[in-house]
């Protein structure tokens, strides 16, 4: 009986256990499991709303059916989630929509998602999912309409199994690491409308089977892919295609004429490829075209006559090709044309005279061609023209008076032509004007600046090398915002007006090669931001004003070839910022000072003044003070040499004895850990990390290892380069490390501890899982580093450097600022790293300690070449290079030809004008807020100014970066349409955006 009862009890336990195991996971438990798999920001609504006090149908992102029992939609986009995606999401059987876009979710995509048979919409874009695509999804998700995996870390070949999803209408696989060829079976989807494989590592030929997707409306295959050959002619079979983007993917050959069959196409982007031959006439058959960009190719021949049929065209970019011939007259008659950019070709003939008469023209850039004739008279008839660039042609005639009434105009660059006549008198009164470049022409007349209002945005006026004459009006003092005023090489006469002292933003003043007379206006010294002053080759007379010595940041002063008299002010010696002067060929007299800054100037700065005396200029006459030093006798010199020899021998003996004692001491000395916070590991744990497999970086300062401590904490261990015994502790090395260990700032990599045995030094830092900015930006994933993230990194790194320069005690100069020394944590937050070359500022604000070379190639400030000194402004220059990297996506050196770095390249491309940033912007970036990029580019140009004193401080950099100008929504929309022209843009802030990165037109 007992045995029977025991068996019965065991049977009941087994049945109970079976029911427990078989009990299905409820949808509530599935959601809670999903929540537990995420790492959630403390401010996330998931923490506040996802709790058991309310029904799960009311939780953030959860939508249920009418019965309020089953989840039908789960949208957790943009909630700053990290962690992994739990496979329990598969226990939401009626789920139709799953969107986790714009988070930081990692790990593989769970194959269990294939059990969600009702799923229609799956959006996992803008995360960090990795691994290969699970083929199980293709067999289970038979009702799937939308699959968006854009911008993840998925690898392997493009999944062929996806062709089983016959209901698919939208497929976005762009921005991953997919490799191999586009499968031929990708031409078999019966109802597909959107296909994007851009931004991967695809190779091979574009399969002709793509032409079978007759329902396709949008096709994106460019950016980072490297296809063989060109476009297949079958592309012409995509009769429903509206947008086609094949930019920057290595295409060659000619554009197939079959493309003319795409009668619904409104956007065609084929820029940055290697297309050759002539532009096919069949493009003119696509009357629906609105935006066409064929720039940065190798097209030859003329603009096709068939383009006259493109009546809807708003954007036409053909710049940087090898096109020639005349610009057809019909270009000027296109009724909708807003953007026309034909620069850097070989166009000849005249500009179509009707250009702009449609009243819609916004951007016109015809620079660097061989155009002749006159300027069209009505380019601004609609008062919408913002940018007018005809730089570097052979244009003649006068500047149309209508431009003086073009209130929308912001930039006018018509230098290096043969223009004559006078400058329109209203030009400088235009309210939005920021830049006027009319240099190297034959303009005559006076400077048309009246007492009326001028634009406060007018920052640059370049009228160099013309035939302008007359005196400068007093109203020149109304140019309150001008930073560069270049009037050299003209025939201006009269005195320099004292009102020039009101130009408080002026940094560069060039009045050389004119006929100015009278005394130098001492009011110039009130322009406290001036760094460059050139008044040479005029008829100026009188003394050099003593007030000039109060210009604290002046770098360059040229007063040569005038009629100046008197002595050179001795106080100029105290102008520490002054690095170049020229007083030659005047009537100056007296002794040239030999102290202070004068010790840096050579005799060529003073020649041509017969009454000057001093070094290199001959002895001073009677009555002129000069010091007389009796030369040393031969006996005294011999005694000095013998004394120095004896001291050297004594020093060598002492050094040998000291080295031996240090060696013996180090052999007996064990490893010693200096901790800068509470640590749960020892030096032995750190030493265990010093393995070849753990190396994550090598540099001049040493080797960096990734270390895992006993409790699982990750650290970065920097083993400093081997030094001679004890040398690492010379010059206050220990004190420096102690100081670094005390630094606590959100945007500076934290030094946790320091291990040393007097032979080897190990610095233990917090670990940054996303590596360096340089690795990310210049690696394949750089294209997925969105503008918002780039701006955030720039601002955070600036804040870190600002702390070192202004708030740290003692103040620190980094000395090696570069993108590889800006590290990114798991949230892509920036941290300034690597103080291996840093030295501490003294109270005087200058660095007295020098290393062999301060900085890395491409980042070194130009003044280092002749001063061999670094200070905060050297760091500012290097940071400016980092900003240019973020904007252009290019490395500092190696991409621009021998001897050309990124700063020189950017200057040549943009002429140092911030509004030309679109000519150098990273082609991998999606559409961006142009005013923000322009603002950051402006900051970069300030940082890389050649003269150190012209650069802002890091505190000013932070302030300027945070003060991005806001523009009204209407203007922002207008600006975006002006630049991208209905390009397939992706809104970075939108988690559901399905388009791949588009290319800014400039």
UniProtKB/Swiss-Prot annotation:
Tagged with keyword Phosphoprotein: yes
GO molecular function: ATP binding; protein serine kinase activity; protein serine/threonine kinase activity; receptor serine/threonine kinase binding
Positions bearing Phosphoserine: 851
Domain (Protein kinase): residue spans on this chain: 690-967
Effect of loss of the gene: Rescues partially CLV3 disruption. When associated with BAM1 disruption, abnormal anthers at a very early stage and later lack of endothecium, middle and tapetum layers. Loss of stem cells at the shoot and flower meristems.
Tissues/organs with expression: Expressed in seedlings, roots, rosette leaves, stems, inflorescences, flowers and siliques.
Top enzyme class: transferase
Compositionally biased region (Low complexity): 989-1002
Annotated glycosylation sites: 51, 80, 97, 123, 130, 153, 164, 212, 237, 312, 346, 420, 478, 558, 587, 602
Coiled coil: none
Transmembrane annotation, as ranges: 637-657
GO cellular component, one term: plasma membrane
Keywords, comma-separated and alphabetical: ATP-binding, Cell membrane, Developmental protein, Differentiation, Glycoprotein, Kinase, Leucine-rich repeat, Membrane, Nucleotide-binding, Phosphoprotein, Receptor, Repeat, Serine/threonine-protein kinase, Signal, Transferase, Transmembrane, Transmembrane helix
Protein localization: Cell membrane
Residue intervals annotated with topology Cytoplasmic: 658-1002
Positions on the Extracellular side per record topology: 23-636
The EC number(s) this enzyme carries: 2.7.11.1
Highest rank taxon of the organism: Eukaryota
Assembly and interaction partners: Interacts with BAM1 and CLV1. Binds to the CLV3, CLE11, CLE18, CLE19, CLE22, CLE25, CLE26, CLE40, CLE41 and CLE42 mature peptides, probably via its extracellular leucine-rich repeat region.
Family per similarity comment: Belongs to the protein kinase superfamily. Ser/Thr protein kinase family.
Record protein name field: Leucine-rich repeat receptor-like serine/threonine-protein kinase BAM2
Naturally occurring in which organism (per UniProt): Arabidopsis thaliana
Organism taxonomic ancestry: Eukaryota, Viridiplantae, Streptophyta, Embryophyta, Tracheophyta
Gene: BAM2
